[in-house]
Amino acid sequence: PAVAEEVRGVRENVGLMEITGFAKHEFSGTGARELLEKLLTNKIPKNGRIALAPMLNEAGKLIGDFTIASLTDQITEEEKFILFGSGIAEGYHQRCFLEHIDGNPTIRYRPLGNDMTGLSIAGPSSRDLLSSIASEDVSAESFRFLDIKNMSIGMIPSLVGRITFTGDLGYEIWVPSSLQSQLYELLTDVGKEFDMNLFGLRALDSMR
């Protein structure tokens, strides 16, 4: 019954879920794009875009299922990439990445761990909710499916991607861990106007 209520809330209005448990791997530096082109089966997306990114081993076996975001560092203006993937397999993937980097000093890799925390909103009212607190235009024309942008949510600097795995309209909002509680309080407060409810992994799995 609880899962059904969570699903109904997402399908009819908007739901909020924590996504910090996913692994976050950051790559930058000369050769980072080429390394990822080699490791992943998909074409690496253009700047400001997201793509699904499976990783295979030499035998063609699936060993990782990621979402990759192509970004520009706000300070250095350097190209960088973030791979979002399984939290359970985070250590295994770290070893794979380091093995392929093989000490290359021009490629910088770091697991972001809990330094980067995330919340996801999904459902037909998610755009209206986000639009009421975002510094950028998040209309369908300006913020397309699989776009990702830096913007302020309220006064909170955030990385926002238009992606969800619920089958509905939705967004992932990533912030430093020090700002997560502030973001949560903002979303839950504003979300009251949109009858927002919380949902968890069981509800998500039933909607995938």
Protein language model features and the residues they cover:
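Glycine/proline-enriched, intrinsically flexible loops and inter-domain linkers
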Residues: P1-R208
